[in-house]
Each structure stands twice: as structure tokens, then as C-alpha cells.
């Protein structure tokens, strides 16, 4: 598909981009990844799912390698809601249990999130920061861990609620954009008063 479906016209009309990818991260051209990164800085919301923590745009926006531990062993995941007042946690129970999911484990090499909404525990013993938020420029980013392709995770009503909440949270505010760069004319008039004749040695 030309431009991976992410040409300028499409991105400029996109309020929130949801990204799921696996294995083929390196096949996304660098210029496409940079295009997505710039749109996030300009205000587009970006929701990154599961193994997409290694996709080029997310890695660029985080500035770290974004790697973690993982294991495929059909283990249970319990997703704890640790910020129940956060908009992404709206209408959720205290925790969500997934009978089978891929296990992820700390350390997760990401910058400290601006907000951490979910933490996951796995029956194999690992824990993981599974719902994390950042702001970059004018854009909002949400990483959500569950979603291995071998399991029906995205058919769960609670997971769909999280994704709907995340889209609502990440959408642009469409407020005024800041002026950046040199401003030659001051916003307020500057009056310079010469007091040199008032001082005598």
C-alpha cells in the first residue's frame, strides 16, 4: 500500500491514530514514521497497542528502545485500574481478568509516564505498566499492553470500553496553537526612561 496508508492527506484528516503492529516494524519507512511523529506533535492522538511498543513512531516519540520482557505461555493477566478517576478508566471495574494472554514483564524501557492508568499482574509472577499516557507537543499518547493476535482480547467489552475511552481522551482539543519562533514586536509596549541625569558622583 502506498505510504503504508499514511499519506499526508490521510494523516491531516486523522484525529486519533490507533496502531497495532507485530514483527514487521522495520518495514515501515523512516519518512512515514517521522510523518506520524510530526502529526502527533501537531496534535493528533496516538494509541499504541500491544507489541506496537516497538513501532518506529512510538520509539521516536519516547526516545528510548521501548523493549521489555515477554513470554507466550497462555497465562492469566489481571489488569488493575490504579487511577479510577482518569478518563480512560471511565465505566470500568476495579480490575479486568483475561484468562489467557501473552506475558510481558518489567523492566519496560520507556520514559516515566505522565500518567499511569493500569498495571498488569500475570499468573507467572510478572507485573507490567500496561496503560501509560504521555503528552508530546500538542498530542496525547496512550500505550495499552493487551492484544496478542492469538487471543480474543479485543472482543472483551471492558477492553473495548478502554479503547473508546482512550480515543475520547486522546482526540485533539482544537484550541489555539502556540506561536513559536522569533517574535519581533512585543505584545506590550516597552517604554524606556532615561534616568542618567539623576545620578551624580
Language-model features, listed with the residues they occupy:
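A short, well-structured beta->alpha microelement
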Residues: 1-8
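Solvent-exposed loop/turn segments at secondary-structure junctions
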Residues: 4, 23-26, 52-56, 95, ...
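Short acidic/histidine-rich motifs immediately flanking catalytic phosphotransfer sites
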Residues: 10-18
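Catalytic beta-strand/loop cores that center a nucleophilic Ser/Cys/Thr
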Residues: 12, 60, 68-143, 194-200
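A glycine-rich, often tryptophan-bearing local segment used as a flexible ligand/cofactor-contacting loop or short
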Residues: 26-92
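Short amphipathic alpha-helical segments and helix-helix/interface helices
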Residues: 33-37, 131, 163
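Extracellular ligand-binding/catalytic regions of CAZymes and related secreted enzymes
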Residues: 128, 136-201
Amino acid at each position: 500500500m502506498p505510504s503504508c496508508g499514511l499519506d499526508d492527506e490521510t494523516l491531516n484528516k486523522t484525529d486519533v491514530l490507533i496502531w497495532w503492529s507485530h514483527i514487521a516494524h522495520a518495514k515501515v519507512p523512516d519518512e512515514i514514521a517521522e510523518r506520524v511523529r510530526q502529526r502527533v506533535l501537531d496534535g493528533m492522538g496516538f494509541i499504541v497497542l500491544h507489541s506496537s511498543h516497538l513501532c518506529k513512531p512510538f520509539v521516536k516519540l519516547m526516545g528510548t528502545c521501548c523493549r521489555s520482557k515477554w513470554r507466550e505461555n497462555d497465562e492469566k493477566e489481571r489488569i488493575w485500574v490504579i487511577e479510577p478517576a482518569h478518563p480512560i478508566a471511565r465505566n470500568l471495574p476495579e480490575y479486568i481478568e483475561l484468562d489467557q494472554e501473552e506475558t510481558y514483564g518489567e523492566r519496560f524501557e520507556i520514559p516515566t509516564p505522565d500518567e499511569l492508568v493500569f498495571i498488569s499482574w500475570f499468573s507467572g509472577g510478572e507485573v507490567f505498566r500496561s496503560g501509560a499516557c504521555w503528552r508530546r507537543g500538542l498530542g496525547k499518547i496512550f500505550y495499552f499492553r493487551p492484544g496478542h493476535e492469538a487471543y480474543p482480547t479485543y472482543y472483551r467489552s471492558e477492553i473495548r470500553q478502554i479503547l473508546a475511552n482512550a480515543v475520547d481522551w486522546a482526540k485533539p482539543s482544537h484550541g489555539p496553537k502556540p506561536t513559536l519562533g522569533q517574535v519581533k514586536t512585543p505584545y506590550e509596549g516597552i517604554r524606556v526612561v532615561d534616568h542618567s541625569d539623576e545620578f551624580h558622583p
